[in-house]
Amino acid sequence: DMGIAIFSLEMSAEQLATRMLSSLAMVDSKNLRNGNISVDEWTSLATAAGKLCGYNMYIDDTSGITVQQMKAKLRRKKNIGLVIVDYLQLMQTTLKTDNRVQIIAEITRQMKIMAKELDVPIILLSQLSRAVESRTDKRPMLSDLRESGSIEQDADIVLFLYRDCLLYTSPSP
């Protein structure tokens, strides 16, 4: 069974597991955190926890990880079929520069090489720049990728999450 490796540079492994659990159980994460859970929700959580434990999943919450460190950890794992990184701009590099565009370019280049060397697909999450907020049309574009250029160059596919209904609904009275 192929597994998933998740590198979460923003959230702790515990926070991520709690989010996954609440999502799988369809229980509000706020209620889960404060313990305000009904009997039915406890049953749902127990079922979801059993499912989660059965997944071949590795979560690493090392902050500021480099591609080299990530690669070393992945080489020690067996049967990883997918790598997810949350998120690009929090990764570090050994490149000696303060130029964020060059740093991101180096990281995306190294990630592309790592994906080929380890023969594994990588989903690399990225922040958007604030430019999207100042436009009338809020649909994200390639130019909205923070410290972009290399992201679209090195990526095989670039996907954006966008929901019209969240941005263009009028407030309820």
Cite the ranges covered by each PLM segment.
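Conserved P-loop NTPase nucleotide-binding/switch module
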Residues: 19-26, 89-109, 135
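Substrate-engagement module of ASCE P-loop NTPases
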Residues: 103-122, 147-154
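Short, electropositive alpha-helical surface patch
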Residues: 132-152
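Well-ordered beta-strand positions
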Residues: 157-159
